[in-house]
Amino acid sequence: MKKIVPIIALFLMMSACVKPDKPKEIRFSVLGDSYSAYEGFVDPETNDVYPYENIGVKSAEQMWWHKVATKTGWSMEKNNSFSGSLVCNFDYVHYYGSYSFLRRMNDLGSPDVIFIFGATNDACAHNGDYVPIVPIGDYVYADWTEEQLCTFRPALAYLFEYLNQMYPQAELYFLLDMDLGSGSIDVDRRDLFIGSIHRIASYYKVKCIDLEGIQKSQWHPNVDGQETIARQVIEALQIDFNV
């Protein structure tokens, strides 16, 4: 017993000197379109941005992703958002197939969480007669052709497949505007896109955050809309990460 006591005391002294591990800093990346593209806060910096000052969003601190970072204590690894971009590789006038989500999905850094925020342009892109022009395509989950990747459903499936393989450590979230294309497309097309996103996200076990009631000016989230997005994203993260 005399020998055991000093050993226990020594163990307790050593334990007291060991500092607990710091919690791992969580880093997130954004793959998006104009809803997330704020001047000076996109990477690459050559990405097209949206002139948010025209609708009253005067600083990056008012953007949804900044609010999420502030609330959670996370840091943004990369914001690879490009105004006007499609998920798919369809190319028409000012809708740039060369800057699609598929062309940029390999440039997100090393995030722990990836937010994919898009599909608005795929649903709403139109010709001079305001007729939607991006084909929705079929449900294809393997062996995609270049032609199929110029349509929405196969492109979204390929995007999720690639992100799961390229960033296996990352949690994926698709942010879905439930009022997709309000005022610019009919309800049937909107519902077709929303249903397609839900189905493909479910197939790949990508978490879909359905965003309701986003306030907009000129079809883009204004100050209140950015706050609405952030609040609903944070609510979802509170369930998964207890932030």
Locate predicted features.
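Conserved SGNH/GDSL esterase-like catalytic core that processes O-acyl groups on lipids
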Residues: 41-135, 141-145, 154, 220
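Substrate-gating cap/lid alpha-helix
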Residues: 162, 170-212
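Histidine-centered active-site loop/cap adjacent to the catalytic His
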Residues: 217-243
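Generic structural signal for well-ordered alpha-helices
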Residues: 102, 156-160, 194
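Alpha-helix N-cap and loop-to-helix initiation/capping positions
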Residues: 56, 140-151, 185-192, 221-225
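Structural recognition of the beta-strand scaffold that forms the well-ordered cores
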Residues: 27-31, 36, 76-81, 112-118, ...
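N-terminal secretory targeting modules
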Residues: 1-60, 70-71, 107-109, 165-170, ...
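Sec-exported extracytoplasmic/periplasmic mature domains
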Residues: 73, 119, 161-168, 198, ...
